[in-house]
């Protein structure tokens, strides 16, 4: 992509679209009368992601053409500059787009009145953009966010109402003009108090234009900044420059579901404070708080070696600067950083005694050559200012400028110090101080670690060791990283699998080396991931006493009288029960990653999709409900799978031969949204894989249309489950039933009923067969029962369906096992059922053929207190409803009469019998189709039809699965329990 400079043409030609560019004569691109399409993006942005497609037309003559050497100039309107979030003279990267994507479908919004007129030729449009037709806007496009609207585009038109009628241009023109600023500088000496937030780049305070006018300051002016606290001398004032903060380029947001809105405006009452300045001020990075700002008036900078003179006040230059390198686990304190420091101080920097300086190392490979340790290059190196001496050693100045011309730099020794949080530049939600879904966990970690950093923290009793447990992918490492960033602590990550060795002595040596390395860069947190891997022998069966003793000694070994900053240890595990007892008891603090609620899953999805273009039909709230039981890593994997599905959909939407490499490149430049169907397909794939791996619950796809008859049973089930969900205020009155028992002959649809309830009520469904919970090992059967209810609580709202409940919970005292396993399982099941009253959104449905074999305690109020009999269909009307539900997805001939089919069937039929009838008829139809294909009587592409003859043959062979004597026995059981 070639570099180009944007130049505002004012006034812009009225006959030219406002979001087009004019090409100068003699430029690098052919300027023809028909024009071409250019892909533009700011020069500072990475080439990944979508670009802005604009129409490039032939510009005016040589009087407005390019003059002199340098990049070519593009003549643009102010509306295009606002969309790019750039100013006049900004540089962009531009490349011609040979084949812009053609839009297959577009949704247009039109104001009340006549709709859009006839189209004349292709038109380059973008989602959220106003059309040349008055009152019309592009609301949605397929398959790309930008492309050509032509004769082959299918259009859908809807009516715009309210503020949706206004495009971004009209909202800009509707603002009131800014007030005059000629007299606002009369109050420049006053002390102003603003609220600071962590943000901005470099070493300057970032403010908006209106805030800059309100402060009465100029761009680049020096100010004193101090933190406002409870005491007058809460923090030492620091010097900083004031810079105008411009909005950031993000085409995905500008072409996102907000339909052309330019994002949230910057708040005028806020000042954006860089991370290093906030750290030196002593501010909390999560909430910078109130700042006191005053203009610097102590002197003026008059450089002698330059032709111009600035009368703005500025700090003096330092004659000497003494610094110490801050010890860190990410770089060597003994390395040669002369070249890095020289390049950093080539630009004058503000220094004050006691400050921590951040020196970036990006693009500087010299530190790798001189590093005595084999460490990868870290993106920044920290130094602490020990002393700064001005030209007048006895002068009152406390802040200086340091550069390579006026200052002599001295570096000796190292220091132990906290360091500020710096943004990584990747702009991911996991790098924030409060990762979405993990805010409460990070707060708990900070509350445990912070007291040890306060003055006198070494006198606290107990060690600062924390055990963090949670399933894989739940965000344990992310939470620890965020807590360390918030507290300014060094973080040394050590995976415990790297500490494992063939002998106990080797493991002991590696452990001591890891702790020794962490102590050299205190205050620090040593993060031991998967600590359950330590303390076991090579077979993994017995404990390694030597390793356990060493690890316990290292965890508890703290010198209470040491003046050094503390070393804190955080260990993570997904199987806390596998930890040796001596290691487990060495952690006085134990935290568990909480299960993500629906609101937390929504916040994670919103953070992950913040910079992704989504289709208008994507409902993140509904998606969060379907992701019940997911951890943070699962939601991240969902977005990855969705992107792959979207790419596959785009490739499949091309011609028969597929999209060429050039077409794929142009489509990626235009950008394409993630649709609801992409999320649905990815979610199905992920849930299937997750369910097969760990038995996670999922929402079934069974509706009431799949259940024929049983109207009374449906009503009783919905009153038990749906009523508390729709009216939670009834729970305070005690009107709650958490258990429901379905009993009756086999094959009557008890399992199908439970699945249909889960689907209709949007509940996850966890099906448990009774015998699969029984285990030969002592205590494992009870653990399996507890695990089932734990998974259900994690996936709430959820239905636990116990099939064959009589095999899991028979009457106690009658089992034949010598160890009393079944009695303990029944007791554990009763305890879990009693604990459901504290969990509002977990319901239990049991199914059995023999309720008389169940333990009587299960049928008492508060447990399975609602018994519902699901019997066989005895009348033709109910049998017809069941048969119609089964055959609703079949292709039936017009001559098929289900009533006549039922007349040939036995009188007593269950749902399983009718399903067997349809399955037998389908098998007969398949045999007939194969025979006709072999004889050439029928084409294979035609649909398979069920004929009346197929159904009648199956009805003639049908035998009821439940005899009349068995049905009578089930009815006697029903009357027995109904009388209780």
From Swiss-Prot:
<comment type="similarity">
    <text>Belongs to the AAA ATPase family.</text>
</comment>
<keyword id="KW-0547">Nucleotide-binding</keyword>
<dbReference type="GO" id="GO:0005778">
    <property type="term" value="C:peroxisomal membrane"/>
</dbReference>
<dbReference type="GO" id="GO:0001750">
    <property type="term" value="C:photoreceptor outer segment"/>
</dbReference>
<dbReference type="InterPro" id="IPR027417">
    <property type="entry name" value="P-loop_NTPase"/>
</dbReference>
<protein>
    <recommendedName>
        <fullName>Peroxisomal ATPase PEX6</fullName>
        <ecNumber>3.6.4.-</ecNumber>
    </recommendedName>
</protein>
<dbReference type="GO" id="GO:0006625">
    <property type="term" value="P:protein targeting to peroxisome"/>
</dbReference>
<feature type="binding site">
    <location>
        <begin position="744"/>
        <end position="751"/>
    </location>
    <ligand>
        <name>ATP</name>
    </ligand>
</feature>
<dbReference type="GO" id="GO:0016561">
    <property type="term" value="P:protein import into peroxisome matrix, translocation"/>
</dbReference>
<keyword id="KW-0963">Cytoplasm</keyword>
<dbReference type="GO" id="GO:0005524">
    <property type="term" value="F:ATP binding"/>
</dbReference>
<dbReference type="Pfam" id="PF25394">
    <property type="entry name" value="PEX6_vert_N"/>
</dbReference>
<dbReference type="GO" id="GO:0016887">
    <property type="term" value="F:ATP hydrolysis activity"/>
</dbReference>
<dbReference type="InterPro" id="IPR003959">
    <property type="entry name" value="ATPase_AAA_core"/>
</dbReference>
<keyword id="KW-0472">Membrane</keyword>
<dbReference type="InterPro" id="IPR003960">
    <property type="entry name" value="ATPase_AAA_CS"/>
</dbReference>
<dbReference type="GO" id="GO:0140036">
    <property type="term" value="F:ubiquitin-modified protein reader activity"/>
</dbReference>
<dbReference type="GO" id="GO:0050821">
    <property type="term" value="P:protein stabilization"/>
</dbReference>
<dbReference type="InterPro" id="IPR050168">
    <property type="entry name" value="AAA_ATPase_domain"/>
</dbReference>
<dbReference type="Pfam" id="PF25395">
    <property type="entry name" value="DPBB_PEX6"/>
</dbReference>
<comment type="subunit">
    <text>Interacts with PEX1; forming the PEX1-PEX6 AAA ATPase complex, which is composed of a heterohexamer formed by a trimer of PEX1-PEX6 dimers. Interacts with PEX26; interaction is direct and promotes recruitment to peroxisomal membranes. Interacts with ZFAND6.</text>
</comment>
<dbReference type="InterPro" id="IPR003593">
    <property type="entry name" value="AAA+_ATPase"/>
</dbReference>
<comment type="function">
    <text>Component of the PEX1-PEX6 AAA ATPase complex, a protein dislocase complex that mediates the ATP-dependent extraction of the PEX5 receptor from peroxisomal membranes, an essential step for PEX5 recycling. Specifically recognizes PEX5 monoubiquitinated at 'Cys-11', and pulls it out of the peroxisome lumen through the PEX2-PEX10-PEX12 retrotranslocation channel. Extraction by the PEX1-PEX6 AAA ATPase complex is accompanied by unfolding of the TPR repeats and release of bound cargo from PEX5.</text>
</comment>
<keyword id="KW-0067">ATP-binding</keyword>
<dbReference type="GO" id="GO:0044877">
    <property type="term" value="F:protein-containing complex binding"/>
</dbReference>
<feature type="modified residue" description="Omega-N-methylarginine">
    <location>
        <position position="119"/>
    </location>
</feature>
<dbReference type="GO" id="GO:0140318">
    <property type="term" value="F:protein transporter activity"/>
</dbReference>
<keyword id="KW-0966">Cell projection</keyword>
<dbReference type="Pfam" id="PF00004">
    <property type="entry name" value="AAA"/>
</dbReference>
<dbReference type="GO" id="GO:0043335">
    <property type="term" value="P:protein unfolding"/>
</dbReference>
<dbReference type="GO" id="GO:0016562">
    <property type="term" value="P:protein import into peroxisome matrix, receptor recycling"/>
</dbReference>
<keyword id="KW-0378">Hydrolase</keyword>
<dbReference type="GO" id="GO:0005829">
    <property type="term" value="C:cytosol"/>
</dbReference>
<keyword id="KW-0576">Peroxisome</keyword>
<keyword id="KW-0488">Methylation</keyword>
<keyword id="KW-0962">Peroxisome biogenesis</keyword>
<dbReference type="InterPro" id="IPR047533">
    <property type="entry name" value="RecA-like_PEX6_r2"/>
</dbReference>
<keyword id="KW-0677">Repeat</keyword>
<feature type="binding site">
    <location>
        <begin position="470"/>
        <end position="477"/>
    </location>
    <ligand>
        <name>ATP</name>
    </ligand>
</feature>
<dbReference type="GO" id="GO:0016558">
    <property type="term" value="P:protein import into peroxisome matrix"/>
</dbReference>
